[in-house]
C-alpha cells in the first residue's frame, strides 16, 4: 500500500507536466462571435457575474475565524455559492459563507459521491488501487485515473458490483442523510434514498449521486475525516462563554470512528491526481508547500446547474477542510469553477502564513 506521508512531494514532479495544457487556438470567426455583446434574456439572467449577488448577506460571523472568512469571501466573490471551512482535527467551524445556502436542504452531490464509493469498493475488496476497469471501447482506468478525471463509467461499475445495500451502508456510515453539525439549529440533514433511485438505479447513484441530497456541512465534515485519518467529528462553533471566562468553550465531539485509515492513501492518491492534472487542477497553488487533495462535482438538478468541490490541505498537520458549492442557471457552473474558489482560498491563506500557524487564529474572547 502506498504511504500517504510525503506523497505529494514525490508525485508533484511526476505530474507537473500534465498540469499545463495548451489552449486550443481560436478561429477568427470564433473571436468575432465572442466579441459581440451578449443579449440579456430570461434564459441567461443568472450567468455568474452578470447579475451580482452578495452571498454574505445575513451571515452571522461572531465566531468565524476572521482570516479564513476573509479569504473565503474574497474567493467566492459574487457567485451564488457557499463555502464551509472547518478544522479537521476538531470539527470546529472556521467559516461559513452564505449561511442561508449552507443550512439549506442541499443539492445533488454530483461526482463528490465518488470518494465514498471508492472507499466502499476498497473496503469490500471489489477493487484494489491497481485494478483496471474497462471504461470505453479500448480504454481502461484504475482508481487514481478514474478519480482524477471523474470517470462515470468506472464508478457505475463499482456501484453495480456492490449493489444498493452496500453503497447505502457506506454512504450512511460516512454521514450522508444525517446532520453533520452539533447544535446548529437551522441545519438540514440532506437526503439519502431508502431504495435505488428510479432513474439510473445504483449505477447513477454511485457515479454522480442520483437520488441523494448533500449539504456543504456534510461534505466539509467528510473532507475533514479524510484529512484526519478517519474521525468523523460533529461540526460546531465554540459555545458562548460565561461572564468572567477568558474565552468561549470549545470541546470536540466525535460522531464516529470510521476505521478507514488503511484505505486513505489510495483515496488521497486519486484526489491528489485530480488537483495536479485532473478536474480539480484550478485548486492547485503552485507557490505553496501544502498540496491540496480534492474532488470536483458537476451536474444539474431541477433547479440549476451545480458545481461542488471538497478538499483538504496539509496532510501531515491538517488545518483546513473545505466544501465549496456554486449554483446557477448557466452551464458555466461546474466543479472546476468551485475548485478555483478553493484554490484562491488556499493561495490567500498561504500568503498570510495561515498554514504556518500552530493554532486557530480567531480571538475567541472577542469573537472577531
Each model region followed by its residue ranges:
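Extracytoplasmic/periplasmic proteins that interact with beta-lactams or build/remodel peptidoglycan
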Residues: 2, 26-82, 247, 251-254, ...
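Short amphipathic alpha-helical signal-transduction/dimerization elements
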Residues: 227, 275, 343-350, 354
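Bacterial N-terminal signal peptides that target proteins for export
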Residues: 2-12
Amino acid at each position: 500500500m502506498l504511504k500517504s506521508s510525503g506523497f505529494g512531494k514525490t508525485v508533484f514532479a511526476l505530474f507537473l507536466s500534465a498540469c499545463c495544457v495548451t489552449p486550443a487556438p481560436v478561429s477568427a470567426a470564433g473571436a468575432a462571435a465572442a466579441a459581440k455583446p451578449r443579449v440579456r434574456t430570461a434564459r441567461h439572467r443568472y450567468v455568474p457575474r452578470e447579475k451580482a449577488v452578495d452571498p454574505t448577506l445575513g451571515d452571522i460571523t461572531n465566531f468565524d475565524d476572521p482570516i479564513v472568512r476573509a479569504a473565503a469571501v474574497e474567493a467566492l466573490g459574487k457567485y451564488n455559492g457557499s463555502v464551509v471551512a472547518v478544522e479537521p482535527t476538531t470539527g470546529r467551524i472556521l467559516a461559513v459563507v452564505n449561511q442561508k445556502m449552507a443550512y439549506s436542504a442541499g443539492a445533488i452531490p454530483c461526482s463528490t459521491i465518488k470518494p465514498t464509493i471508492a472507499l466502499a469498493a476498497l473496503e469490500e475488496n471489489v477493487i484494489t488501487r491497481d485494478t483496471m476497469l474497462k471504461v470505453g471501447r479500448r480504454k481502461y482506468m484504475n482508481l487514481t485515473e478514474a478519480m482524477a478525471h471523474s470517470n462515470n463509467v468506472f464508478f457505475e461499475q463499482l456501484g453495480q458490483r456492490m449493489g444498493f445495500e452496500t453503497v447505502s451502508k457506506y454512504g450512511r456510515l460516512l454521514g450522508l442523510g444525517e446532520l453533520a453539525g452539533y447544535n446548529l439549529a437551522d441545519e438540514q440533514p440532506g437526503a439519502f434514498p431508502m431504495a435505488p433511485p428510479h432513474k439510473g438505479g445504483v449505477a447513477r447513484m454511485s457515479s454522480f449521486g442520483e437520488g441523494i441530497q448533500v449539504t456543504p456541512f456534510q461534505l466539509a465534515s467528510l473532507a475533514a475525516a479524510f484529512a484526519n485519518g478517519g474521525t468523523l467529528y460533529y461540526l460546531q462553533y465554540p459555545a458562548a462563554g460565561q461572564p468572567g471566562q477568558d474565552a468561549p468553550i470549545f470541546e470536540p465531539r466525535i460522531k464516529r470512528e470510521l476505521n478507514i485509515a488503511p484505505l486513505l492513501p489510495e483515496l488521497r492518491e486519486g484526489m491528489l491526481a485530480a488537483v495536479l492534472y485532473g478536474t480539480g487542477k484550478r485548486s492547485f497553488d503552485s507557490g505553496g508547500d501544502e498540496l491540496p487533495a480534492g474532488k470536483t462535482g458537476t451536474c444539474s438538478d431541477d433547479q440549476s446547474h451545480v458545481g461542488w468541490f471538497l478538499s483538504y490541505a496539509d496532510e501531515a498537520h491538517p488545518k483546513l477542510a473545505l466544501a465549496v458549492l456554486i449554483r446557477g442557471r448557466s452551464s458555466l457552473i461546474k466543479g472546476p469553477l468551485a475548485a478555483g474558489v478553493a484554490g484562491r482560498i488556499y493561495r490567500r491563506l498561504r500568503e498570510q502564513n495561515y498554514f504556518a500557524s500552530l493554532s486557530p487564529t480567531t480571538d475567541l474572547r472577542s469573537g472577531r
